[in-house]
Each structure stands twice: as structure tokens, then as C-alpha cells.
Amino acid sequence: MNAAISATARYLPEGVLSNLDLERMLDTNDEWIRSRTGISERRILRDPKKATSYMCGEVASQLLRKRGLAAEELELIIVATMTPDMMFPSTACLVQDIIGAKNAWAFDINAACSGFLYALNTASQFIKAGTHKNVMVIGGDKMSSIIDYTDRSTAILFGDGAGGVILEAAESEGFGVLDARMYSDGTNGKDHLLMKGGGSLHPATHDTVDQHLHYIYQDGRMVFKSAVTSMADVAAEIMERNGLTSDDVSWLVPHQANQRIISATAERMGIDESKVISNVGRYGNTTAGTIPICLSELDDGGHLEHGSNLVLVSFGAGYTWGGVYVKWQ
């Protein structure tokens, strides 16, 4: 039996970093930011004692309440993140502790902005195989912890947030996660979107800190071109493999990198913007959090009906990208 989404949830911190705030910090302005990214503000987790696990823990608690599950009923927790609280233990283990899911095993997946789709695809296999009944999948990042707020090319893009889902066996055939295609390209991707510092190649030293190696670096032009092409191509592949036309697609749920990428992807797919969810203007790019946050907003807003066809697409560092076809039950 296919895996189906039985609950959704999201967490966005209360702190807001607006374009006007960035005007006071950087050589930029609101009009320039909005025209190039579509972003007006982003959420920031300002409490230095709280990190990615806190946001993911909030999502996990909501998911349990919404689905009416006890924490002990969870069998697996997968967290997609590129900003773990620490190198180890995994953020998923920290979330397990936060909610008291003592019977679940837990691990992280790091595929940057594609992380949630990688995790969703991975988790669905355990349901489909019949070895697990209740699996929690969360995507979240505290991007403000790795942003250089003197670099306007990246500081304007990213925000903090998390979202997640619970997966269970679909109630009937033909619903749930019906197809997925995942890709990676380390050859062309490794130099254009990365954080050099903090790993075994460049462990923390005075030099790595002075050189700003512990902040995200992005070649915006290269990433833009690759993101649009890759997301549109994998979406087209998903649609072709499953006999879907643009009219059949109820919602395109794209990674919220920036509005230009979202619009260009939808245009290449021939999907009307009225069927494309976009919240990047309010939250910025929350990396692994974008797609589950979108799903939660659609769900809470009553926009997902029985039989709705969702095409989820993402692109991230690596390069990594992928698409998932979900028929809502």
C-alpha cells in the first residue's frame, strides 16, 4: 500500500526581518529585493538558545495533536536539514527526545533545499514495504545561523522555519505518494552553492572564521539557471510518467527559492499561476522547510480535496533535485 499524508504542520518563528530592516544593514532597498526575489520579509528565530531542533520539535508536537497519535506510536522520525543543532547527534534524535517518541528510530537527511523530498521519498518506502505504520517526516532550517548579513546576495534570500507530515498507509489504492524521481549532480553543483567551513576539510579555525567560510556561498546566476531547468524537467517527467496534463494538476508545490524561479518553473510547465502555491514573499527561502510549510498552509486553508493531484518539486545544493506526485486522500 502506498504511503499517504495523514497530517501536516508548520512552525514559523515570531521574529520578522523585513526588507526595510535589511536596508539599514546592507547596501540594498526594498524595491530592489522585491523585484529580484519577490521577498518582502522573512522569519527569524532570534533566541540564541533555540535552534533547528526547537522548530522541528514544535512541528512534531503539532503533528501528534492533529493526528491524535501518542508519541510512543511513532516508529520512525526523519528530519531533513542542513543546519543541525550540532554535527552530532542528529537533529532527529533531539526531536525524538523533545516529544518523547521512545519507540521511534531517528535520523537526518542533508540534501539542502531538496531535503524534504528526499526524506519523503525515503520514508514512503518503509510504509510501502509494510514494515512501519506511522512515520514522521520534518524539514526545517535555521538559515539565519549560517547567513553572512554583510553579503546582500544571500542575506536577502533566506529565513527560518520548519514543516512536516505524518505518513501512514493509504486507505485505498491509487492515493498517497504515487511516484518520485530524485537526482544529484555533484560534478556541476559542488562549486556553486556551498558552505566551506565547519566540516572535516575546513574545521573551525581563526582563519576560517576570518574568511567567512562558515556562511553560505551562492553563485546566484548559475543556481537560478540550473534550478529552473531541473525543477521544470523533473516536473514534466513526473507528469509524463503518470499521464498528467497541466489541467490535471491541482497544485504545483515548488521549493520557495525566489519568486522568479517559481514563476519561471510554472511557465515552463504550462501551469497557471493560480495553481502554484507561493509564500516566499512572507517567509523567504527556509530551505528544507519550504515544501512542508506550503503543504501545511494548503491543508489548513482547505485547498486540498480528496483526489487532488499535487506535484512537488525542489532543487538544492549538491546539486540535488527531485519531484514527487501525491494524490491527496
From Swiss-Prot:
Pathway info: Lipid metabolism; fatty acid biosynthesis
Enzyme class: transferase
Database matches in InterPro entries: ACP_syn_III_C, ACP_syn_III_N, FabH, Thiolase-like
Gene3D superfamilies: 3.40.47.10
Record-level Gene Ontology MF annotations: 3-oxoacyl-[acyl-carrier-protein] synthase activity; beta-ketoacyl-acyl-carrier-protein synthase III activity
Keywords: Acyltransferase, Cytoplasm, Fatty acid biosynthesis, Fatty acid metabolism, Lipid biosynthesis, Lipid metabolism, Multifunctional enzyme, Transferase
E.C. numbers: 2.3.1.180
Residue ranges crossing the lipid bilayer per the database entry: none
Cell membrane in keyword set: no
Reaction(s) this enzyme catalyzes, per UniProt: malonyl-[ACP] + acetyl-CoA + H(+) = 3-oxobutanoyl-[ACP] + CO2 + CoA
Subcellular location(s) of the protein: Cytoplasm
Keyword Cytoplasm: yes
Cellular component GO terms held in the UniProt record: cytoplasm
CDD domains according to UniProt: KAS_III
Pfam family, one: ACP_syn_III_C
Subunit structure, interactors included: Homodimer.
NCBIfam families: fabH, PRK09352.1
Biological role stated in the UniProt entry: Catalyzes the condensation reaction of fatty acid synthesis by the addition to an acyl acceptor of two carbons from malonyl-ACP. Catalyzes the first condensation reaction which initiates fatty acid synthesis and may therefore play a role in governing the total rate of fatty acid production. Possesses both acetoacetyl-ACP synthase and acetyl transacylase activities. Its substrate specificity determines the biosynthesis of branched-chain and/or straight-chain of fatty acids.
Protein's name according to its UniProt entry: Beta-ketoacyl-[acyl-carrier-protein] synthase III
Organism of derivation: Chlorobium luteolum (strain DSM 273 / BCRC 81028 / 2530)
